[in-house]
Amino acid sequence: MALTRGRLSNVTAIAGAANANVVTVANNKKVYVKSIAIHDGGAATGTACTAYVYVVPNGGSAGNANRMFNVALTAKETVLIEPAYPIILEDTGDTINVAAVGGTINVLVNGDKEV
């Protein structure tokens, strides 16, 4: 199995009270999420907010049952989530979904994917 390493998503801006799929498996090619960078990218004065990261199986939806991380961010803070073992997405349609509450966040996901 050959892998490509690097960025799994572009920087994705997610506004308060919204969520977005930032990585989605295509053609049953496994995706290995090694890190998720989240930045509180709100207004120039900054606003504290919360980011939620979900691992959603194909056909599912983001919710308490698949929430993996709950990150409280102060104004203009950046956090890096690096699990000890990669999060593995295996089936077409499996996603990493990220939500923002109370402000705007920017998200970047890095890792490996099958080619």
Q: How would you describe each model-predicted region?
A:
Residues 9, 51, 69-71, 108:
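Long, low-complexity N-terminal extensions
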Residues 34, 46-51, 103-107:
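Short beta-strand/loop motifs in extracellular/secreted proteins, especially
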Residues 37-38, 111:
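Hydrophobic beta-strand positions in extracellular immunoglobulin-like domains
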Residues 43-69:
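Short, surface-exposed beta-strand/strand-loop-strand elements in extracellular ectodomains
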Residues 59-92:
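Intrinsically disordered, low-complexity Pro/Gly/Ser/Thr-rich segments with frequent PxxP/GP/PP motifs
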